[in-house]
Amino acid sequence: MSSQQLLQKPDIKISVKQTFGFESGMKAGAFSKKNEYVPKIDPNYKFDKDTTLAILAGFSFNKRVLIQGYHGTGKSTHIEQVAARLNWPCVRVNLDSHISRIDLIGKDAIVLKDGKQITEFKEGILPWSIQNPVALVFDEYDAGRPDVMFVIQRVLES
């Protein structure tokens, strides 16, 4: 993950009615500036009100949100489009067979420092996402390997 410093808390409030186009008096926390992890806005995207409000509640109260549905129905895209309008960083992790516990947690890596090789811990996506305000989307959840799912379950329970 990038070493770019992310804002730690939303610094503005936006109108849900103006931003998402449906009746609501809710204001949602958002970021005034984009960074490299903010998805691109699809101006033609149509939001489902109930799903959008659930996602916004997750952002507002730092809660995990589970969105389920058939393959290809736009679950991940919905989260990304909400995040895009809030300038909220969003990272999608595909849980296919190529992801490992090391990718999630981190690993020791050999790096050069002052002309010498040293071993340094490089954190994975989970420690990084816990330390930063990020929407972490686990895609293809049912395809995750048991060892990977064990790590994710521990995070979801915390």
Q: Residues of each region from the PLM?
A:
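AAA+ P-loop NTPase catalytic core and its hallmark functional loops
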Residues: 1-158
